[in-house]
């Protein structure tokens, strides 16, 4: 199935669907070993205590594009009820097998709001969900998904502070 927004470097290819969910992660060969298998990796937003997964069915207005003359995504996600607009830029490093995401949040409310982002991974490492393992590394404050010789490290950085604050595996 064609995807709406692909980014990659020849060794790592990531495809997004029309609702800005990751659906395919090909590594180390483009077109072979899809570690997502078409299953969505969701992205969620909580404003104060009101939570929504990103997607048109959840009330999001979604505009997908690339930054001019680049393979850097520029997705604009607006939710009127939550009162926020997110500008999300994604890229795969040109030389390394690294996927990066930058999220800028604009609050449309008259008062300050607590905004939390949620990243949900649903790996099918080596094209099978059997034997996938996820573990939290407290020393580095990262989550690692692995099976066999394939490892995927998940990390975040907020205001120059690296590390995952909350996580769940299972």
Range-by-range predicted roles:
Residues 1-170:
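Terminal accessory carbohydrate-recognition/targeting modules of carbohydrate-active enzymes
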């Amino acid at each position: 199935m064609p995807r709406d927004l692909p980014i990659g470097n020849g060794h790592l290819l990531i495809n997004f669907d029309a609702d800005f969910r990751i659906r395919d992660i090909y590594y180390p060969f483009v077109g072979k070993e899809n570690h997502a298998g078409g299953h969505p990796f969701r992205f969620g937003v909580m404003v104060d205590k009101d939570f929504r997964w990103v997607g048109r069915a959840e009330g999001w207005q979604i505009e997908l594009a690339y930054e001019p003359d680049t393979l850097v995504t520029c997705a604009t996600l607006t939710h009127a009820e939550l009162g926020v607009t997110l500008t999300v830029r994604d890229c795969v490093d040109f030389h390394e097998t690294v996927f990066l995401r930058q999220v800028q949040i604009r609050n449309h409310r008259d008062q300050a709001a607590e905004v939390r982002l949620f990243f949900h991974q649903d790996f099918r490492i080596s094209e099978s969900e059997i034997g996938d393992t996820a573990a939290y590394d407290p020393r580095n404050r990262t989550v690692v998904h692995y099976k066999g010789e394939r490892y995927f490290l998940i990390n975040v950085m907020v205001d120059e502070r690296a590390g995952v604050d909350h996580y769940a595996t299972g």
